Amino acid sequence: VSSTHGASGASAEIPAPGAPISHTEKGTQRFARTALALFAGGFATFALLYCVQPMMPMLSQAFGINAAQSSLILSLSTLTLAVGLLITGPISDAIGRKQVLVVSLLAAAVFTVGSALAPSWEGVLLMRALVGLALSGVAAVAMTYLSEEIHPHHLGLAMGLYIGGNAIGGMSGRLLSGVLVDYLSWHSVLGLMGGLALLAALLLWRFLPESRHFHPRPLRLRGLLQGYTLHFRDAGLPWLFLQGFLLMGSFVTLYNYIGYRLIAEPFHLSQTMIGLLAVLYLSGIYSSAQVGALADRFGRRRVFWLVIALMLAGVALTLFDRLPLVLLGMLLFTFGFFGAHSVASSWIGRRAQQARGQASSLYLFSYYLGSSIAGTLGGVFWHAAGWDGVGLFIASLLLIALAVALHLARLRPLPEPQAAH
């Protein structure tokens, strides 16, 4: 094993001949470099995806479209991202993790700039579809890289830090676009986001250490189908895939339509104020790492259902017409979501024993499919029954998620060191 790792410049000790290569542990330089690089990747992924969310009411006016149609600017991206995950995960199993991560983020940045230059709504949607497809290479591979390289005892923390990057990216993307769109055109805002993503891609290339535990798998269709079938035979993985759909579907639905609610009576918030609500993501940054660490300590099965219950409580508070209660509800909901996603993500990596890239891909396929389907379906509930309809829809998704989490808590864990409790 070389003492340097390609363009990343990360160093590692050279093991004795025949000695096993150790996993990366907390407190080492390699852990810090990995955390920084994937934090940047997670940041850019969510910033590029969700910077369009605060613009949706404005896009409705600019293009003469309704809320459900406007939501396509996000739903189409998450749909192509979901489909892309079924391709990019297996590609990374064949050619390596870092290469796929860096090229994917660079492509997403270029397509985001392309969306800013598109002359029509259809052109914007086409570019956004390509953004989602490119980001699939970051979304699946980052989780797999961590599962392979980080010591199992520190995987929950590392996954939490990565998802914290997602949270900060989602917050920053919404915050920047929500505020700037009052002063700049939406074209300019998207161009700016593309430039920031280019910087994140450079960070990822420079700091992410090359894999030490990656073993190439030939890219064969039969092997892919066998890998997917293998994961669905596991007693826990299919339920975790379903959780991705339910959790992300509820989360995106809330943030897609809360802007429409808060612009209208009795709140009358400005576009800038709605953009500033992205600071609620700070709770997700804290919860993703802390809940992940708690799951490492007390067990995922004991923590998972609690954070989902917290999301339900948050949705209930948003049904009131008092702004402080709505904001508190959004805070609890966001805290619970990122905590739950952190637990589920690390659980996938610990439970999948083979073809981990495909396991991550299946989880995130369900995750972003939930975003795409539920995120647009929520618009139907909004037009039919206002926020009460949206709240009922979200609560229904979360009640199913809670039942699934309680079922997972009763599953017999795999023997150590194969899976976490």
Task: Set out the residue ranges of the language-model regions.
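Structural signature of the two symmetry-related core transmembrane helices
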Residues: 99-113, 302-316, 395
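Paired small-residue
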Residues: 107, 111-114, 122-130, 324-332
